[in-house]
């Protein structure tokens, strides 16, 4: 934990090459600029391109270690690398990671996360927006209010109060959720427990399964086009099923007399 009212940035650079001279040449290509303007502290890495060079058996690693007061806002951009954050993050966070992974704890303020071509794992979220593309696995423990745009990605959420989501070409698993507003295309979605309301504006060429519907649920509304919906209705509750404009489909209700 960092209890000082300052920001400390430490950068470690490692270059491996076939000779010491060649390693030094690669090291000289790396420029790291840190500066402070007003209340903003920034650090940017620039790697100069090399012309007509054989880079076989060569590599470089750049690690940033940042210590700052937990309530400070942060804007993090990482490409071809990972972002690891502490267990508690209290400031507003704007995170962009491509070709790398994000591993973080809890977020108590607003969070914007863009992840492409990697994996993410976070703890608890309050108010967050996620933009996911080609994410192999995205794990979220608990969340209060989420907006997610997901393409070619797989998500696993434990518990969430409110979710607005568009998912295409992926998989979604939610253990427990109160309110859902979704668009599902070419995907598979599984919900453990739905507590209150579900609205799916488009279930297209997709599968949606709800394992447990709370007896106190208020509404389940699904607009399906070549999609499959399976809902386990509670035995001791009253409900009404309205199936309209059905073509090339069927509606089966089992287990009720």
Segments predicted by a language model, with ranges:
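Eukaryotic tandem repeat interaction scaffolds
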Residues: 153-230
